């Protein structure tokens, strides 16, 4: 009993001592202790056992009263992840040394194929960041003397990759000036009651813009990526962060997967469409009244695809933020707070309108798309809307430029060295040996054309290398010429969302940092199957109705 009384007196004395020197004592309290005040009582909320020792053992030396530092965290592993590294290297070595080289393929071509597969597997498994691993693949191609230095780096002069980089800088301008936030707020005001409605609005808006902007790359980089980033950030969804799944990653995936259908619906919606038409004419397939014919054949399956794709991704890759019934009213109030458009927003809007005009009419006056983008960026730099430090600090732009150039260069050399032609010959011989009907040959060749795109980093390059031989094989198998020519062209558009390197928009959207690499491959493959079912199922009935077969 005496012991209990003494302990109570000690605790009371300690409390009074603390109460008299509260300012000094609270300055020494560890962060885990919070002080709550009521009108009649000041109490201590204790969540750390060290406070009890400090309150009752005030006679201990001052060093012992100091809060102890947290234990050091274990060091992060340095360098490449060993298991993904070992798997990637093993794939390259197995192809190079254990699988017999076909007679039709040169030693240089086979060695490049092994390095390409080594690079692609590393991009999927992720032993290092994407740009770093692509650079290692590039180095391997030079060290092994598979490619000379000038050839390995030749793709860094490719117009497409610089158009991608400049599009990132445009997106930076939209965000810096606040124009992207303003446009995004209007989208929320009109369509923002649900995330799904927002994705439908963006998808159909891109389809309509295909009438005036004949480049999926230009639409993605100049318009929709800045808007999506502004929408995501305004919702608290940030790249490279767990919050990316809140909104940004869903909108990125939806817009990328819808870009295939929006690029296929019109002859002028994508740059490679006109190339396919030209190549079909060289093979002997002439399409009369091409603009109208193209739209009639593509319209129904493309429209069904645009209706289904956002909903399927909503189930497959759902956003955390789904319903926002209060968002339109909040967006209207935000627009009032933003006030009138600022000077820099007008400059940004004017520069982009001028750039888009050059994208639309530039070909007629001899100005390429990348040159139009360079003129627009130069205008923004000269007028100070963005500065060079803004461009230098955009890591996504330079990272995308690096790895995409590496893959474009390797894929182009696979074509030049005969590897792609060998694959086409293998498919042709397989079909001949099976003696299939023309519908079966049509399905197999379309599937092969789609899947072989994993070896290409450019839809235009894919069409230039494989469109003529695959069209010729289908015609030889008895497939109606117009049906084969148009379906291969539609297929060429849909293949652009297979992976992060499948085309300019894919590289751009992946570079925004909202989607993990594995999710890019997973969603890309699943949606490729979905698109094949939609276009093959709905399309076959529609094309029969049109009399294509």
Curated annotation (Swiss-Prot):
The record's region (Disordered) falls at: 57-79
Which InterPro entries did the record assign? CitT-rel, SLC13A/DASS
Pfam families, per this entry? Na_sulph_symp
Q: Name one GO molecular function term.
A: malate transmembrane transporter activity
List keywords of the entry alphabetically: Chloroplast, Membrane, Plastid, Plastid inner membrane, Transit peptide, Transmembrane, Transmembrane helix, Transport
Q: Name one GO cellular component term.
A: chloroplast inner membrane
Q: Which residues lie in Pro residues bias regions?
A: 67-77
Give the family from UniProt: Belongs to the SLC13A/DASS transporter (TC 2.A.47) family. DIT1 subfamily.
Mind telling me what this protein is named? Answer: Dicarboxylate transporter 2.2, chloroplastic
Q: Can you name the source organism?
A: Arabidopsis thaliana
Q: What is the lineage of its organism?
A: Eukaryota, Viridiplantae, Streptophyta, Embryophyta, Tracheophyta
- The gene it comes from is DIT2-2
């Amino acid at each position: 009993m005496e012991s209990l009384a003494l302990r109570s007196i000690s605790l009371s004395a300690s409390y009074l001592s603390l109460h008299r020197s509260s300012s000094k004592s609270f300055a020494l309290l560890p962060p885990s202790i919070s002080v709550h005040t009521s009108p009649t009582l000041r109490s201590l909320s204790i969540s750390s056992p060290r406070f009890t020792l400090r309150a009752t053992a005030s006679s201990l030396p001052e060093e012992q009263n100091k809060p102890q530092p947290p234990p050091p965290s274990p060091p992060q592993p340095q360098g490449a992840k060993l298991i993904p590294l070992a798997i990637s290297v093993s794939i390259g070595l197995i192809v190079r040394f254990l699988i017999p080289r076909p007679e039709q393929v040169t030693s240089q071509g086979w060695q490049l194929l092994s390095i390409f597969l080594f690079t692609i597997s590393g991009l999927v498994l992720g032993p290092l960041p994407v740009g770093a691993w692509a650079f290692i693949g590039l180095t391997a191609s030079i060290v092994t003397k598979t490619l000379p230095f000038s050839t390995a780096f030749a793709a860094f002069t490719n117009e497409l990759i610089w158009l991608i980089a400049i599009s990132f800088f445009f997106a930076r301008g939209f965000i810096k000036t606040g124009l992207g936030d303003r446009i995004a707020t209007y989208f929320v005001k009109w369509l923002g009651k649900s995330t799904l409605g927002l994705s439908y609005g963006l998808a159909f808006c891109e389809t309509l813009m295909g009438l005036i902007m004949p480049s999926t790359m230009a639409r993605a980089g100049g318009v929709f990526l800045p808007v999506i980033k502004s929408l995501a950030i305004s919702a608290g969804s940030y790249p490279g962060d767990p919050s990316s799944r809140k909104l940004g990653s869903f909108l990125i995936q939806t817009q990328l997967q819808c870009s295939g259908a929006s690029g296929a619906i019109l002859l002028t919606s994508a740059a490679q469409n006109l190339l396919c038409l030209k190549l079909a004419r060289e093979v002997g397939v002439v399409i009369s009244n091409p603009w109208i014919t193209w739209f009639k054949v593509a319209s129904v399956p493309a429209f069904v695809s645009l209706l289904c794709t956002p909903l399927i991704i909503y189930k497959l890759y759902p956003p955390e933020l789904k319903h926002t019934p209060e968002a339109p009213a909040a967006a209207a109030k935000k627009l009032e707070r933003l006030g009138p458009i600022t000077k820099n927003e007008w400059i940004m809007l004017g520069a982009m309108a001028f750039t888009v005009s050059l994208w639309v009419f530039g070909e007629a006056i001899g100005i390429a798309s990348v040159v139009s983008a360079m003129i627009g960026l130069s205008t923004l730099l000269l007028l100070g809307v963005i500065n060079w430090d803004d461009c230098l600090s955009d890591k996504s732009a330079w990272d995308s430029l690096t790895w995409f150039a590496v893959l474009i260069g390797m894929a182009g050399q696979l074509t030049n060295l005969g590897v792609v032609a060998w694959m086409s010959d293998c498919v042709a011989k397989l079909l001949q040996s099976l003696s299939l009907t023309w519908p079966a040959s049509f399905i197999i060749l379309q599937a092969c054309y789609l899947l072989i795109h994993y070896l290409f980093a450019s839809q235009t390059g894919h069409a230039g290398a494989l469109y003529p031989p695959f069209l010729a094989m289908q015609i030889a198998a008895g497939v109606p010429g117009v049906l084969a020519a148009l379906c291969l062209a539609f297929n060429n558009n849909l293949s652009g969302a297979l992976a992060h390197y499948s085309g300019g928009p894919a590289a751009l959207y992946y570079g925004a940092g909202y989607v993990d690499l594995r999710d890019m491959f997973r969603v890309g493959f699943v949606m490729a199957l979905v698109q094949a079912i939609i276009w093959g199922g709905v399309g076959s009935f529609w094309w029969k109705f049109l009399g294509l077969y």
